[in-house]
Every structure is written in C-alpha cells, then in structure tokens.
Amino acid sequence: MLDKNKQIWFIGIKGTGMASLALLLHDLGYNVAGSDIEKYTFTEVPLEKVGIDIKSFNPDNIKSNEEQVIVKGNAFKEDNPEVKACLDKGVKWQSYPDTVEEIVQMHTSIGISGTHGKTSTTSLLAHVLGEVAPTSYLIGDGRGKGVDDSRFFVYEADEYRRHFLAYHPDYQIMTNIDFDHPDYFKDQDDYTSAFQSAADQTKKALFVWGDDKRLQSLKTDIPKYTYGFKDTDDFQAVDIKKTTTGSSFNVLAHGKDLGRFEIHLFGDHSILNATAVIAVAYTEKVPMDAIREGLLTFKGAKRRFSEKDFGDIAVIDDYAHHPTEMRATIQAARQKFPDKKLVVVFQPHTFSRTKKYQKDFEEILRDVDKAYITPIYASAREANGDITSEDLVKNIPGSEVIDLDNIADLTKNKNSVIVFMGAGDIPKYEDAFEKLL
C-alpha cells in the first residue's frame, strides 16, 4: 500500500508507465525515487526536472518494507539484481497495475483501453476534464500528473499480459479490439476475452466504438454506449468538416444535438476519440462550453502526429506501429498536407508483429509516394526472428532500407511531409535527419 511515511522505490522507473506513475505520486507529495538501466530514455527528462533521483540497478538500493514501498516494473524478473535482493531479503513488492488500482479507487476513474488510440484519447480526456475540475492522470507516453483532491482520475489501461485486469474503474472507453501482441495472446479470441474481462470490472458505464463488431459482442450488466458516425450510435458525430487546420462536427447524444465542436487534430480517428471524450464528459454532466473549450485548446499527445516545419519539408513523429494505426496516421497526413509528397520512414516493431502483419505493412507502404524502412526494432523479450526489413522492401516498389549511416538520403525529398512512425527508438532517426536540415 502507498504510504507517505515511506520511500516509494520504482524498479524500472524509466518505463513509460512507471515514469508517469512516479511523476503523479511525486506531485501528490510522496517521496519517490527509483532505478533503471543507464541507457538514456526520453522519460528520464521530466523525472530529473522535478528532482526524482534515478540510480543504476544495485541490490543495495533495496532496504526493507518498513522503509520502502517497492513498485516493480512488469518487465523485470528474478535475474534483475534488485528483484533478487527483494527475494533474498524477504522484501515484498507491488506491481505497477496494483499501484495504479489504488489510485483508481480514490476518484471518479476513467480507463481508456483498446488496441489503438489509447494515448491520444487519454491525453484529450485528461485535458478536457482538467479544464473544469481537479484531474489526475497517467498517460502511456511517460506523462503523469497528480492533483490533490482530484475529482477525476484518467488513465491509460494497457491490455498487454492482461495488465488492465488489475483495474476496476467507474467508466471505461474501449476504442477498438484489433488483434495485437502475438507474442503473448494466442489468437483473436484470447485477445477479445481480455477485453470482456475488463468490461466485467467496469462499474458505471462502458463507451465503445460503434463500428467494432468485437466491442459490440461484449456482454455487460452496465450501460454500454456506442460512439461513431452512424445513426445507430448513442453519441454520433455529424456534419463533419475537414480542413488543413483541423476538423469540426456536431455531436448528437441519444438524438439530442449538443452543438458544434472543433479540434485542431486530423483524421477520422481523431474525431472518434473526441466523440468518446464528449460522451464521457456529457455523462458526468460536464458543461458543454467547457468541453468545447477543452477540445479547442488541446495541442496533441506526445509522439502522436507531432509536427515540425523545416521550410518546404514537414516532419511528423508518430507512434504508429500496427497497420490500423499506420492507415490512420497516413490519412491524417494527407488531410493536413494535401499538396505535399508523402514520405514514410517506418520502423517495424518486434519480429513477431512484423511477421504477423508483413502483407499489411507492404500494402500500406505501397500506397505512399516513398517508403523507407529501418532495421526491425527488437524488444527485450524478443531479441531476434526470421524476418528482416529487406523482406518487406523487396515487395514495395521504390522503397529502401534506411539506417543512420544513410539518413542523408531523406534530404532528396523536396516539398514533402516525412512521417517517422514506429514504437521503438525511431526518434533517433528523426533527430539525425533534422540535424541535416
């Protein structure tokens, strides 16, 4: 249990979820510190900014349960020196999901789950609710904020290894169920069953995308509201206008017109995310004008269609690494930059996912003006595989394999929007390219 009289020690503090949680607890007045690998990660910047101490893994960091509450990252096993020290000393730990569940039970809680769109929707909902009431949040891009006496707690609920089954929220948004994590889930049915279990643990209402048949198949004893573009949806986005500055639309709530909303975001998926946010806020009786203002002032989530301009070249950084996400990002890029050449630099993420979706990746990348593919990003749990980036390139006419040593090839693309997409360390490719501009 969390205790302000003890140090909260994070084993693996630089993981995106762990970093978010550390920031949230620090904001709430807890004594937070932790350890991780020495290799630089972007999540350590906000931790260091607020003075959270980050050490290298060392068994001497582990004291006792009288002095510390140990929060262990999901990726760390008995071969980690601090996990081993806990076992040797009889020191108990709690998991990241179990710690988040403690916070879930303190507030009106809204979890955001789904294969795609979790981070964007969590960021947007936290921003909108934060305009009207104290709101704490945990976002999967390494951001977390704790506010004393929060009315709302908004958090990203990750389905990997069924971690989100530790949570029992008041509300839950489910954006979609699109098979992923083939290294853990056996098949689509196994994957869908995890979401059914998560739905079973939601207390007040479930908000689901109306076009997703698997979401429609979920059985619940609580209200299940749909959102989308169809007349049959409980919350329907209508009269949609798309421009190069964003999108605007009206929302009908059970047939009642809630008025006009505007977002400086792009693509159908952004309108769907906004409609889900409106649905939750409306259900919690948040004033419509406050929702409108929150949507209008939202500037986007980290690594979700993040833009930079370099003369006639626009650079977009996006986390997309699944075919559905890639299609959405490409659609958004075409909306924002209809007159530019569309160039994609794609980093395949894990060998198992690349093998599973090889044909989808090839089909998507054949439809852009120019595709570059970096070497496959291997995860800690899957160091190698029987597929390479070259296997994709040979099926995508005009595409090339790109690495840091030939990143200058990208400068040949004039009057272009260059989209760097991937969930691994693709920012290093973007950084190297930008130094050439």
Swiss-Prot record:
Residues binding ATP: 114-120
GO CC entries: cytoplasm
One GO BP annotation of this record: cell division
E.C. number(s) listed in UniProt: 6.3.2.8
The organism's place on the tree of life at top rank: Bacteria
Pathways involved: Cell wall biogenesis; peptidoglycan biosynthesis
Keywords linked to the UniProt accession: ATP-binding, Cell cycle, Cell division, Cell shape, Cell wall biogenesis/degradation, Cytoplasm, Ligase, Nucleotide-binding, Peptidoglycan synthesis
Localization, UniProt: Cytoplasm
Keyword Hydrolase: no
Catalysis performed (reactions): UDP-N-acetyl-alpha-D-muramate + L-alanine + ATP = UDP-N-acetyl-alpha-D-muramoyl-L-alanine + ADP + phosphate + H(+)
Gene3D superfamilies according to UniProt: Mur ligase, C-terminal domain, Mur-like, catalytic domain, NAD(P)-binding Rossmann-like Domain
One of the record's GO molecular function terms: ATP binding
Family annotation (Pfam families): Mur_ligase, Mur_ligase_C, Mur_ligase_M
UniProt cross-references to InterPro entries, sorted A to Z: Mur-like_cat_sf (IPR036565), Mur_ligase_C (IPR004101), Mur_ligase_C_dom_sf (IPR036615), Mur_ligase_cen (IPR013221), Mur_ligase_N (IPR000713), MurCDEF_pg_biosynth (IPR050061), UDP-N-AcMur_Ala_ligase_MurC (IPR005758)
HAMAP family in alphabetical order: MurC
Protein function: Cell wall formation.
UniProt record similarity statement: Belongs to the MurCDEF family.
Record-linked NCBIfam families: murC
Protein name as catalogued: UDP-N-acetylmuramate--L-alanine ligase
Originating organism: Lactobacillus acidophilus (strain ATCC 700396 / NCK56 / N2 / NCFM)
